[in-house]
Structures are given as structure tokens and as C-alpha cells.
């Protein structure tokens, strides 16, 4: 038989090119070899010298999956069901990285002879002992180090068992650093885009599709094959902490963006395609959070025990499903559906009318098996959100377990309930023992045949996401290609242009904008009180200039004297408050306080006297009402600074730039300023390019901006477009799809298609 393949050994990797067939790559250190058949080469992944179907790249993926799934032991399948806790690949000692640091031969990185791309002791243990093959990576030192670490992972597991590769995943990592500089033609560490709300503010599904395509290529160059995104929760509750990670509250827009995002990430083209749109540049999209997490009562978030209930006072549950069922599950790129789904932590209160069960979505047989799988025909991977099988010890801890509604069950029983609900995978769990205990519970209740079939059904789903992106043939990364791909100048350019398109001009009194370059600008410092981040880490009080002076100087002369300034810029953030107060608890209260979207202290005069949902083993009450209670924003000084700056500037132009994480009450300062720009996580340079007239604003509001907190209290958590909107002194209503360009209110095809009158 004529040989139809060639071989190259370089940098410890064997690369085999089959004529008109797959390119294979494996490590010289892993101990595997090749099998020859019909003149072609195949990886002998389990080192038995036999060309079994799962090794044969010529066969349909379904046959390969069936073969391998039936060979796996229950323990190996249980390992596939694990999705690791957060892994940091960095030498940084900041608080975030330190939380996820490992050891090297028992030593900290700086005390060992290891380099940052080596595997930690903990990683080696869960890869071998627990058969874990799905890893969530957070911060990485550099693209090249990420690629090397990925290769080290793949080489390590290649010589184990059946040679199943690792599926590395990531939460969104394309956010822009405000003070970084964009240089046309220059590359970067990764392309920089606006956050999800900013992508939504473009009202351009094709831009989002382009983002997915670019970000997917960058992910694969980093070794990442699964994206824990998009977050397509319909953001109908304006106070929600995760509002900025969504595409807003318009179901038609969110649905189209969901489709575009997933198609962009998942679709491979031409030579990169393996089959049906899937291939070597594809990234599995894990769409979240089923069945929609945007209706938490009073805006509280289910990462915390104080926010575990989603409510539906408007009876609008089904509309929250549409971004999934009409978007992520109806893709145009050939891959058909998002490869994975993540249910949210929330208890979707009183939505299970059949079983009358109020448990976290990942535990709900009705929401996962009956609704998602049976009614909507979804047979992809379902993965829990992180840590739902662990106990919670505090009401306000981000890192505590999220065992909502099943607190009385043992850890093994929780795993078992998740599996019976139709879920395949456990986010944030590194240990196989509880899954094996769940297997034994199933065997005792239903018999070995039933529970084994249940495990193999999940194995097939999980293996599909490895096969369809080509990891069995070539899981390795070329570091030189990584350097060329990640942060490529073309990608950086498109990301920067998307940032510019995402900026919304809300107010332009007397056409004060644009402001010609080389004028003199005054930018006051921001003042923030002490606070805590998501993880409970203390952030000290501070005063700081909100922009990099050198960046501003490229456009305008910067002065600290308002008298010398031609105009002023006030950089603000939307008000920051929490719906739970340890101080209130310490004073004998329940801890529940209102989340405020205004800068001045707020007292709830219209809040519910009885909450719609409540109850927790750590609480002796079930009424989570905050009626009559008060709260204040840690950044109230943002408003003070606007008032002070107006006094200092007299009648000279004052522009407010609001970094908006949530819809913000603007009536407190709108009449004091001449212009308002809304920023969704963009570089300062993008803002300056618009302020100076280099580009024209085109962003549109993907949500409503309320006139006052009373409107927020009256709206229903699950219903969109039910607030009275702010109307400015020019009589413009800050409603969904509103925005200005230099000539006035935008009325283009986007508004016609997605606006409230469409």
C-alpha cells in the first residue's frame, strides 16, 4: 500500500500530514505512536495497536463517539462530567490570581524551579486520579505562555487511558482596558471589544458575528476550545448586578445577537472545517443562563444566597426563553445549535407547575429534562453553574456554595439530583468521588442498567464537543502562530471600531459636540468610598484621575485649573449599591436593603411590603422586603463632582461620560451638563476619538433609562419596557433604541427593525 502521509518532528511534537486527510499532532513524550491503514496514519491513543473507530478520523463523528463512549469505565465518564474550578496561569500575586494559585512539588511557584506554564500538583492530580478533562482558565501571563501551558496539559493527558484531550474553556476575555492605547497597525495581547451591552448598543448582529469569528480564532490560538458565553439572559430587571454582561432587554435584538455570537464562535470555514460548520477554528459556545437569569427579585443576584430567587410577577417566563430557543438553538452557520447550555443559579420561583418544585435551575427536572430537552429538543451538553453542589455558609459570600433549594441533601444526593434532572456536567468540581457516589445511589434506586445508560448518554454529549472541534486529531498550539493570531492588527482594528460604534450620545445641548482638538480640558478626579469587589475583597477609599493624562494630551491640552479650560469632562460610573447589608443585619435588621440606581441616598417608599419569594436555612424569616429602608451608592461623589465642576466652569461646556453597568437615574444631573455619553467598557481613546469628531456617534440604548427610582420600583422583574423613561430638557425620551448622532435623533434601519414601534 502506497504511503499517503508525511511526518515532521519539531519542538517535541510529531506532526503527520495525511494526503487529503487530517493533520495529526502528538507529543514525543506521551508514549503514543501511529497506526497505518490503507496508506494513512492514525494516532494510537490507547496504545493497543488497533485501529478502533474512535481513532479513525475518516469515520463520521457519531460512530467515533459511540465507540469511545462504550469503552469508558464509569469512573472515566464521571471524570468527563467534571469541570474544573478556576485555574490561573500567571506569576502575579494579586488577590484574584492568589485565590486560584497552585503548588509545584509542594512549593509555591516563586519557591520552586517550575515555570508558570508547568502543570500544578493539583492539576496533575485531577487529570490522573479524577480523570478530569474540562478546565476553566482565568488569567494567563501571556498568549505564548497560555499556548505552552495548553500544550503541556495535552501532552500530559495524551499518555493516559484512552488519550482523551483536555477541553480548555474561558469566560469572556476580550474586554478593553480604558487606559490602554490603540495604535493602527499594531498588535496587542488580545483584541479589545466593548462588553456585551456595548456589542448590543451597536444593534448590529453582523458585527457580533464578526466578533465571534475573531474571538474564536484567538481562543483556539490560546488553546481554548469552549467559550462560557454568550450571556443571553433577557435583562428585564434594571438593578441586576450582571446586567452589563447581557445584550439588554429587547427580545428581538437579544435573540438575533445570540444567534450571531454563537454562529461566529462555532463556525469553521473552508480548509478549517471538519463537518457541518465545525472544525479547527471552532469554539464550543456555552450559552447561559437557562431559562434566563434576568428577573432576580428586586435585582438581587443568585451568586449570593440573598439573591437566589427569580420571580415572574408579569407572567412573562416564556419570553425569557426566546434568546435560546429562537437564537442560540437556530444557528445559520451550519453548527445548528450552541454546543452547551448553562442553567443559572436561580430558583425560578413557581415555574414548575407540574412537580411544584422550587430548586435551583440546575436541579430542576422540569426546566432541564422536560422543558429544555424534551419540549425544545436540545441534546447538547448541559453544565451547571459553578459550585452548586457545595454547601453555603454565609448569605453574602460569592465563593460559598450555591445549593439553592436542596440545602438538606448530602453532596452525593445533590450530584444525583442534578444527573436525574438531565444535566451532564458539574461546574467548579474537581473530584470524582461524589459523582461515583451518585452512581451508586442510582444503581440502588433504578438498577445498574438504568444508571449506566444515563452516564453513557452524558459521555456521548461531552465527547461530541471534543471531537467536533478536532481535539482528538490535533490539540496542540503552535506558539509562533499564537503570537501572530492573538491580537492581530486587523483584529485590534475591528475591536476598536466596535468600541467606537458602541458609544451612545444621549445629550448634545446646542451641538456642543464634537469639540475640536487642541482645546483645553479640565477633568476632575473621582472620589470613591471603601468597598468590596465580587469576591469580597476590600477595596480602599481612593481619589484618582479617571483617565491616563498622556492619552488625553494626544487630543486636548489638560489643565487642573477650570478657569483655564475651554470645556470639562466628568467621568462617572453608574451608582454602585448592594441589596444586602451586613450593617443592617448587625443592627437587628434582615440585611435586605434596596438596590439603588440613583446617586443620592435612596429610601424605598414603594418597595413590596412582602417579598414574592424568600427563605433560607440561615434565615429565621422568609420575607425579604426592604420597604422603608435606605441605601446609598459608594460612588455618590460622582454626582457631587458634576455639581462642583458646573460651579467651577460657569457657563462653559461640561460633558458627562457615564460608564453604565446598569440603567442609571440621570435626572439628578442631566440639566447641569451640556452633553452625556454612555460608555460600555471602552478605551478612553475611543471616547476621545468621538468627542473630537474623528468618528460620529451611532450607538443606541439596548435598554430603557428610568426617570426616577419610583419607576424602577413599579416595574415588574420579568417584563421589558415597563418603565417611565427619563425625558431631557430637549424633550428627548431615553427609551430603548434611542441615541443621537451629530444631526439629531437616530432613525435608521436598526431603529426601524428593533425599536419599540417595529
Locations of the language-model features?
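Glycoside hydrolase catalytic-domain context in secreted enzymes
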Residues: 1-758
